[in-house]
Amino acid sequence: ITAGVTADPRYTRMTVVLYCSDEMILEQIKKQLAKLVDVRDIKELKPDESVRRELMLVKIRVNENERRNVIAISDVFRGRIVDVGQESLIVELTGNQSKLEGFLNLVQGYEILELARTGVTGLSRGVHDVRYLD
């Protein structure tokens, strides 16, 4: 679950990721969410009709020699080094879940000091959107 501001300050957008192959269960979940008083709208973001991303920050312990290797791995994944300490780096990565997991697999030989992930958020492709009208 992720939540954040929208173009309309009256609303907060929440993204709930469900892995469900049973359409009846998915419809039941949507109906239950729609009953909540503060729910304005529910939109299903199908993988082929949406863009989804997740943000991850990873603090990795590195010595002088390891630093170059971790930076090179980060570059391959289009990560950004957002902090450099004497014995650590913080890497920022944005992408789909498999990209972030791929990065973590490659740096598993290093000591990960801290890890923070936002969870998935997304928008539908094209001009269709959720309008914030009363």
What are the residue ranges of the model-derived segments?
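A conserved regulatory-domain signal marking ACT and ACT-like small-molecule sensing domains
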Residues: 1-134
